[in-house]
């Protein structure tokens, strides 16, 4: 009886530790969805797409322009050599997407990234860190930046765009897409999804954000998100 009691207590203790670990890494937001998907029957796949959504921040941790430009130079000098050595099934080499932060605007950096884009090695899209923001301010920031990317740097030239439209894709710099952090930090815009759509955003690549508490329960999926104002 004592032996069984000890085993039971060890099992309970182990379960408590596992649950604590799951909650500490915010896995409880998405683990159920993941386990349900694991039970699904595998489907045959013939084509694999690899999407790289790089939160590209040459000024991360520094305000030194020379340091940022040294980081840029490494990409400009080495990425075409590395990517150019590899081809996919249709003969195309890897193309890296630089999601560039609005608040780090540097025309020289973006000119260099635009050159990589013209050579077929890259693309540039929109990335933003903000806090305590408003829908009006966010809208102005997005429209101003996308216009600059196209008119000043020749970027965001997308096939199928309607006249006057500047389509773009987006990553939220602090993962708090649509003001999703429980403490309300690093965004502030409850209707951010609507603002993104109305300013030309065609897809958001913020997720996955685990182990952040901004991670949604829906994982490993391509889907239409639905926001709720307020």
Listing of model-derived features with the role each one plays in the protein:
Residues 2-230:
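Catalytic alpha-helical scaffold of carbohydrate-active enzymes acting on polysaccharides/glycoconjugates
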